[in-house]
Design a protein with these regions (language model features):
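N-terminal beta1-alpha1-beta2 module of alpha/beta enzyme domains
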Residues: 1-66, 71
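Glycine-rich anion/phosphate-binding loops
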Residues: 18-23, 80-93
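A short, terminal or domain-edge coil/loop segment
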Residues: 57-60, 90-95
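Conserved strand-turn element in the central/C-terminal portion of the radical SAM core barrel
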Residues: 73-81
Length: 95
């Protein structure tokens, strides 16, 4: 059986972004340390203020450089809102 963690973070103002992002990084590290297999993130647009959700592929690429064993996935990806070439490049970053 495999277990995953779903990361989602919201802030009420840009001043909170650093704290929110650092908390998500810490959660991902703890998930890996505790033996979870994957971290999933949302790819939602225009749903309130969630700094990581605007481009979770970049955030996942950052986490991939920090973590060694865990896999990454997007829980929802709104493909029509992405340019096809840019989307392929973002996904390729994680390969």
């Amino acid at each position: 059986m495999r277990f995953s963690v779903f990361l989602v973070g919201r802030s009420t103002a840009p001043e909170q972004d650093r704290f929110v992002m650092q908390s998500l990084i810490d959660h991902a590290r703890q998930a890996e340390d505790r033996g979870f297999d994957a971290v999933f993130m949302p790819d939602h647009h225009f749903t309130g203020y969630a700094p990581m959700s605007s481009d979770p592929f970049v955030f996942a690429a950052y986490l991939a450089g920090q973590l060694k064993k865990i896999h990454f996935g997007m829980s929802v990806t709104t493909v029509p809102l992405h340019h096809p070439v840019r989307f392929a490049e973002r996904v390729n970053l994680l390969d």
